[in-house]
């Protein structure tokens, strides 16, 4: 069944803009869950630009749905994940100069290293998802390294400049989902999804979870977080 993972990074972005204590992502996670979020997602970046170590540790204690920790495949982040033990980890690419994650992880180009990281995490009981572009080579590599999930990068779909191009990108996502399922992978998706473009992605066969942050938090500024989460669930066709 399709579910909604709410990414609360930008609650922390607002807090860090003033280097203060509010708004608190931990409190936001509680509100999101009460409004119907099926999971909470946070990205602990190496530069700590928004989510902080404190947030991850407190969220592990307070989240009642599931906690998805997005992180780079570095020794530091693996050590934190092994300590905190989120419900699952999503490995993502990371560059300090980027505003947000700009593309999928190049799994095919680092199979040996990622196999080791995935094995270390999953050997400790932490399932691993890989954030990848909807590319056949990357999907095959994700299966090769032993990941449980792939999260398909929906950025090109979200940024398509015409209906025709959007349909092309949607077709790529559908084919990628089908390939992943055939290889025994579970399928999530995210990046750039909004209230206005989420519907077709939500209807892709086999899709398990959509991770959405910026659109929900942007709307929450105007209507409140509870309503913003509920409206996203409606846009996804969830009750």
UniProtKB/Swiss-Prot annotation:
Catalytic activity: 3-amino-2-oxopropyl phosphate + 1-deoxy-D-xylulose 5-phosphate = pyridoxine 5'-phosphate + phosphate + 2 H2O + H(+)
UniProt keyword Zinc, yes or no: no
GO biological process: pyridoxine biosynthetic process
Keyword flag Transferase: yes
Main subcellular location of this protein, as a coarse class: cytoplasm
Active site location: 43, 70, 191
Annotated EC: 2.6.99.2
Pathway: Cofactor biosynthesis; pyridoxine 5'-phosphate biosynthesis; pyridoxine 5'-phosphate from D-erythrose 4-phosphate: step 5/5
Site (Transition state stabilizer): 151
Ligand binding (1-deoxy-D-xylulose 5-phosphate): 9-10, 45, 50, 100
Subcellular location: Cytoplasm
PANTHER family linked to this entry: PYRIDOXINE 5'-PHOSPHATE SYNTHASE (PTHR30456:SF0)
HAMAP family the UniProt entry points to: PdxJ (MF_00279)
Function: Catalyzes the complicated ring closure reaction between the two acyclic compounds 1-deoxy-D-xylulose-5-phosphate (DXP) and 3-amino-2-oxopropyl phosphate (1-amino-acetone-3-phosphate or AAP) to form pyridoxine 5'-phosphate (PNP) and inorganic phosphate.
Name this polypeptide is given: Pyridoxine 5'-phosphate synthase
Organism: Synechococcus sp. (strain JA-2-3B'a(2-13))
């Amino acid at each position: 069944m399709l579910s909604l993972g709410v990414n609360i990074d930008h609650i922390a972005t607002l807090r860090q803009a003033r280097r203060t204590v509010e708004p608190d992502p931990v409190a936001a996670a509680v509100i999101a869950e009460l409004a119907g979020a099926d999971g909470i997602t946070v990205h602990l970046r190496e530069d700590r630009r928004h989510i902080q170590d404190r947030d991850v540790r407190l969220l592990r204690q307070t989240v009642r749905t599931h906690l998805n920790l997005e992180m780079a495949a570095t020794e530091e982040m693996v050590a934190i994940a092994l300590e905190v033990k989120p419900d699952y980890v999503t490995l993502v690419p990371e560059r300090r100069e980027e505003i947000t994650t700009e593309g999928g992880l190049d799994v095919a180009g680092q199979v040996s290293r990622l196999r080791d990281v995935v094995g270390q995490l999953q050997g400790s009981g932490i399932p691993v998802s890989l954030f990848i572009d909807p590319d056949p080579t990357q999907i095959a590599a994700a299966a090769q390294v032993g990941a449980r999930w792939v999260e398909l990068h929906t950025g090109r779909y979200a940024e398509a400049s015409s209906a025709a191009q959007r349909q092309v990108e949607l077709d790529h996502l559908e084919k990628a989902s089908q390939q992943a399922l055939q290889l025994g992978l579970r399928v999530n998706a995210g990046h750039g999804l909004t209230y206005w473009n989420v519907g077709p992605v939500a209807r892709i066969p086999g899709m398990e979870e959509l991770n959405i942050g910026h659109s929900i938090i942007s709307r929450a500024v105007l209507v409140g977080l509870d309503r913003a989460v509920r409206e996203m669930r409606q846009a996804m066709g969830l009750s």
